[in-house]
Design a protein with these regions (language model features):
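Sec-dependent bacterial lipoprotein signal peptides
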Residues: 1-19
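An acidic, charge-biased composition feature
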Residues: 17-248
Length: 248
């Protein structure tokens, strides 16, 4: 009876807690939906503008003019069409192959918005001057009459799990937005005083902006970007490029 009396309060406690446990377990699966900035209407697609940058043989790729295009050309278009562009991102690459040195702007929108953006870019005086100066070799546009990538995951890497393909566009949109805002934050501080005029001055100006962005990335990227992303994933290590675990 002594043992029974010792366990009796615990038994009452467990009985009292059972209703609470049952309530905690009542997860309504249909109510759990992915978070998105807005309900994406049908009839949209991913579109690309590929800036094929000049890259002479036996030279290092020139990256800083991407910042000029992004800041002075793409950023105003994003602001003007912000209600019709649901997602967007940048991609930069330099490889000695058919595509070569390329700066690509992806955006998810209706075809009419893509058509308007393409027309605006084709008549943009900055791009015309940049091509005349030999900085850009060619600009390749998608065909807005044909939606080849209608799904949100159609511009993601097909080697990834489908769950990542569907959610990654929101992640890279945020990363691209921060990069562009960082470029603008740095550039706008100096543009107020003595803005560059000639292509040579523009080249020098955005080279300096690029160097500052690179310094910020190298000195603060581990904590500001990688560490806090690692924190979201519970500080779990990941398999790095060298096929070993690393955390931030």
């Amino acid at each position: 009876m002594k043992v029974y009396r010792n366990w009796l309060p615990i038994g009452f406690l467990l009985v009292a807690l059972l209703p609470g446990c049952a309530a905690l377990g009542q997860i309504q699966k249909p109510a759990v939906k992915p978070i998105s900035p807005a309900e994406l209407p049908s009839g949209n697609g991913w579109w690309r503008v590929r800036f094929r940058m000049n890259w002479p043989p036996d030279t290092d790729p020139v990256w800083h003019m991407d910042l000029y295009i992004a800041h002075q050309v793409i950023m105003p278009l994003l602001e003007k069409n912000k209600n019709d562009i649901y997602l967007w991102r940048f991609h930069r690459r330099a490889k000695r192959d058919g595509a070569g040195r390329q700066f690509t702007f992806y955006f998810y929108s209706p075809p009419r918005t893509a058509q308007q953006i393409f027309e605006a870019l084709q008549s943009n005086p900055i791009l015309i001057d940049t091509m005349s100066a030999g900085v850009i070799d060619d600009i390749v546009y998608d065909n807005p009459a044909n939606i080849e990538r209608p799904n949100i995951d159609d511009a993601s890497d097909k080697n990834w799990p489908l769950s990542i393909q569907k959610t990654w566009p929101y992640y890279i949109n945020g990363g691209s937005r921060m990069w562009l805002n960082l470029v603008a934050e740095i550039a706008d501080q100096d543009l107020q005083d003595d803005p560059p005029a000639s292509i040579e001055e523009i080249d020098s100006f955005y080279r300096q902006v690029d160097e500052t962005v690179t310094e910020l990335w190298q000195e603060n990227g581990r904590h500001a970007f990688l560490h806090h992303l690692n924190a979201v994933f519970e500080y779990e290590p990941l398999i790095y490029w060298e096929k070993r675990f690393i955390d931030f």
